[in-house]
């Protein structure tokens, strides 16, 4: 999967069609990817409505892997948009989830921010010219930044939500 910050979005038949402005390189091997097709993904937006997304599926002929192109307001493997996560973390009363879910979201974000900051520090050591200024971001911008970095460098694992939430695999 790849997170894109610059994308075109238009609605057709109630489905938001998301298309990245630039085709990103493969996060696994760095090869050039080709568009293979589209898939559907549903996410709850900040008003609590279910929003259908049509996402591009990209194929890397070099490593023979498929990747979905996600907009930066979608968190991988989560059904709520990033804005709901940020509102729950900031404890505003505008979020559309119950208090128990909001508490779980706050714990997940706290752990994810720690993991994202560690990933960025490691990248900064490997690439000293990397510019990082995420301390000045709002919660939503910081969340989008960390999700984009962690996913695009290949550090996001499908079990990351279990690892980050402190649940053991045993």
Predicted regions and their residues:
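Acidic/histidine-rich catalytic cores and adjacent linkers
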Residues: 57, 158, 165-170
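Short, positively charged, Gly/Tyr-enriched micro-motifs
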Residues: 64-151, 165-168
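A structured, charge-rich N-terminal accessory region that forms the first stable segment of a protein
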Residues: 5-7
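Short cysteine-rich clusters marking metal-coordination/redox-active sites
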Residues: 26-29, 60-63
């Amino acid at each position: 999967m790849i997170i894109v910050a610059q994308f075109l979005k238009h609605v057709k038949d109630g489905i938001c069609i998301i298309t990245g402005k630039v085709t990103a390189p493969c996060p696994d091997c760095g090869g050039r990817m080709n568009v293979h097709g589209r898939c559907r993904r549903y996410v709850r937006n900040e008003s609590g409505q279910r929003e259908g997304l049509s996402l591009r599926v990209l194929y890397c002929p070099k490593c023979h892997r498929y990747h979905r192109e996600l907009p930066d307001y979608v968190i991988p493997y989560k059904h709520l948009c990033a804005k709901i996560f940020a509102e729950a973390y900031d404890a505003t009363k505008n979020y559309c989830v119950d208090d128990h879910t909001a508490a779980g979201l706050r714990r997940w974000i706290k752990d994810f921010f720690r993991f994202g900051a560690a990933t960025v520090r490691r990248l900064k050591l490997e690439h000293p010219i990397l510019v990082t200024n995420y301390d000045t971001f709002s919660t939503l911008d910081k969340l989008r930044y960390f999700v984009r970095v962690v996913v695009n460098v290949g550090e996001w694992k499908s079990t990351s939500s279990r690892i980050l939430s402190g649940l053991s695999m045993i």
